[in-house]
Amino acid sequence: MPGQVAGTRDRRDSRWDEHRRERREQLVQATLTAVSKHGAGVGMDEIAAEAGTSKTVVYRHFADRAELYVAVCTRVAAQLLPKLRDAMDSGGSPRGMVAAAIDTYLTFIEGDPELYRFVVDQQTLDRPTTDPLTSLSDLVGAQVAAAITVALQQAGADPSPAAPWGHGVVGMVRAAADWWLRADRPMPRSALAAHLTDLAWAGLSGVVSTKEDK
């Protein structure tokens, strides 16, 4: 009998945990929709209204706005990273891989600038949190570094600079993308992507490119 009671309790706990996970995902999706409707400065009342509930219910699932913010950023990173990987995989040459990654990142920003602003701007949070793009930038930097490593090895060159170069490219692109958005996109995305690719490749081509890439 005690075993049956424990088993019933475990099943109830499992169902409740699953319900909580599903409800959190629904609230994250509601936040994304609310950001699209109301902009990066969306309030918790607007998020709750989009979810068809109250702020009290939202705070049952997220301790504060910062926790919800981190969950949204995690969702954004999970959606963006596979696109970046696919773009790099289809890039072909090392230069093509760098160009594809840069354009994919800028396409994300251009497609939903308010969501990007929501992700990078923490001024509306009730407590500070870590930069949500740091982990994503680290992952992307590692991907770029891996591509550079292969190219260096193929060229018979020392692969040790690949990591700082890969992360340096990502940092440059992020800084330029932030400027582009703040300046109200003074040039087309394609032009910015081409300029950044040219600048990045000017530093890399001497040691990683083939004659066809130069």
Q: Which positions does each model-derived feature cover?
A:
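Hydrophobic alpha-helical connector segments
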Residues: 71, 86-114, 166-169, 193
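Basic, helix-initiating cap at the start of DNA-binding domains
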Residues: 1-50, 67-70
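Alpha-helical DNA-contacting segments of helix-turn-helix folds
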Residues: 35, 69-76, 119, 136, ...
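Amphipathic alpha-helical packing segments from all-alpha helical-bundle domains
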Residues: 128-153, 163-171, 175-178, 191-194, ...
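Short hydrophobic clusters on alpha-helical segments that form packing/core surfaces
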Residues: 27-35, 80, 84, 105
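Short secondary-structure transition hinges
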Residues: 100, 107-146, 156-161, 186, ...
